[in-house]
């Protein structure tokens, strides 16, 4: 169930770290579908942050694709420790249906052998670099929207509890865009 901390406090979450200046939402592990949970969030609201847990019901790729389906013309860069075949297929389907204007991946080089089948699916379709990375970040943007997704979950589904937040703050977006662009620029110089 989606709970706005400004209106109601979830008994399972200590809200003492949340101020009234930072609206948040909690996505409970009892919820059925990601789309049901995210339906109440207006990603066009500027400078908002929503916090969530997943309990294995959705992953980084699921949220990115869901948001891209709601806001047209989104560009996307995603970083992850790994990539599953399912996530790769979902990104390809989303791309083929026009959900993304651009889509790039930054993936962990040391663990690449663990997800080589997924890499083969997207190789040549999307820009992809491999480096030493453990961060799981998704950036979505167009001329009017700047959305950041940071989560403990990778581009793979598991039944573990994952935690993260979604922000529509331009400052948060550019904080992550700056270090991600640094990785992309460093990789371009090595090629």
Features from the language model and the residues they span:
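PLD/PLD-like phosphodiesterase catalytic module centered on the HKD motif
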Residues: 1-191
